[in-house]
């Protein structure tokens, strides 16, 4: 064993051994409990960052710990490889997106291997590989046959910089989540997944995921947004048409004084009178350029335009002017809102701006609202007024009564509504999975036959930066023959949203070599669901919701038997430096390559695991990195120093141990218990590492180390340190384990078990209070009774001065913990 710890020598050696021996390659083994561990796979941007280091280190600790506990661990890695950055790089550097992507994958793979991550690299996949996306095309067509995929014209979020469509979830504060450009509205023919078919199941199953953070589940429930209410028909004055409204506040129907339509509403122009048309069209054009998220923000200025049309309130028969309003969205409810300005704040602000009438229909207890004097809408429960037969009722009770009345009168129906909308997956870009359909003027939309799959991306596309979809300019790709009628036709040039690829990759990891379909049902049946999934909170209503939908859809197609993909979810915190998330623009980036070159991967891993609990943000500290490096050097020197003394010592004989050796052994077994609990139940890596550090201190303080009778307990202590550190710092642990004379590797040795008897304290430390205030502590035998504890307390030099000259009225003893002496 070398006297000095040189990370580069140690880490290179063991990484080579792991690769040669295929140490982390796994197959299905029914004789072992399985454990499927997965971190969210990265986009191959070119370099890993410290967020990756932290995320993957967290996962690796779990994987190595579970292996040492006897689990058959699947821990794969791959690449979420489609997306706009590759096209942007192609324009900038004049190289093909595939070349840029695969070069990045090669480099990032080498970085991950240098971190010592225990991946089964034989299962590696990249979503841009034809062997991956061809199966996605097959599943797309099967979903199309089942009515889970359809095409329609719709207003979409459009990023003018990326020149592509964004899902609602990909718009952040009105900006593109990729490039931060302002998002506008554009009407396009789009392909959709019918995720709404699963809205109720997606919602209900959030209650069956106890291993998920509650805040993620709440975010998904809110996104799905189930609400109970009524659909009400409002006749249009002078026309046969009606405007259908969904509301959860039918108790306010008698106070509805005007109608607000989304500017995109299909009836918007139909209802507009000729003299109002120019102004209405100008307003619609203006709103189309505004992002939906901004439009619904509380502080966004409420604007509208009168259409010239009127609806009739079906219960009051009053005329209601019909407005288009910028805060009403087509994709919630019906896109039409019965406006009740006295009891809805947005309607109130709009009514004040456009001088529209107000009618109070709910009065608070003991108060009378005057519409003219109101400064804000009243939105709480109260007593019904100006509401015909419902006057005097509590408003929450009146909801059901009014719903029944509307159904009896044939003007409304009780309805359940969901905020969730179908998932638009069309993207106007090259570097994505081609949508496998053909557009024929005679036959319409024609699925590509199975025998013609996969539809492969052409390699001769040109990336000029001129805008638009490069795929649409490749004539050899676009111009095809209709497989049904033989006429000239055009291939679909939209590609799929990259979230489609990440919605099922965890299933393909179970069977990456399967050549008969996307998923081997038997192998997926062994591994699924993923037992522990690790990734960022930012994916709560994007990737995580889509993956849940895909799993349910594929279950119904017969590919899998599970209904949920991820049993447990850990959302790790960010890496912070100088008070902000690391980013190039802020100049606070730490380069993992430089860190590993200087300190080694084990130090990088140890610091990121020790500095904060996984779910919390980690504040970067150069001093903390130095401290982690010093600790590994201490452990190395400790093993080097005790090696001559422990030789081939066997297991300790508890009956033959002296007091000091017995104390050390107690510390060893208490530490094993502590670290096991921290890793197995809580993922408290920082407290587990802290416990091992305390054990190292105890070993260093233990004397005499060179006494033959102490060799067994010293060997047990040092070996336990190495085994307990193995999931955190695997290279150092393997090297030290080998130096201690073991063959087969520290991970193969299994996880150390603790002896409950060895953890029992022989003495107890009792806190002594006088009149409730701490005055001393006494040590007594573990089996000492109350009288012995009192005697020790009365004799203690720190306690006696507080008792002298005082009358002891009583003593209250909490066994094994505390003695409170009451004096007067």
Swiss-Prot record:
The keyword Hydrolase does not apply. Its EC number is 6.1.1.4. GO terms for cellular component: cytosol. The keyword Protein biosynthesis applies. One of its GO terms (molecular function) is leucine-tRNA ligase activity. GO terms for biological process: leucyl-tRNA aminoacylation. A motif ('KMSKS' region) lies at residues 581-585. It is found in: Cytoplasm. ATP binds at residue 584. Belongs to the class-I aminoacyl-tRNA synthetase family. PANTHER family: LEUCINE--TRNA LIGASE, MITOCHONDRIAL, LEUCYL-TRNA SYNTHETASE. This is Leucine--tRNA ligase. The lineage of its organism: Bacteria, Pseudomonadati, Thermodesulfobacteriota, Desulfuromonadia, Geobacterales.
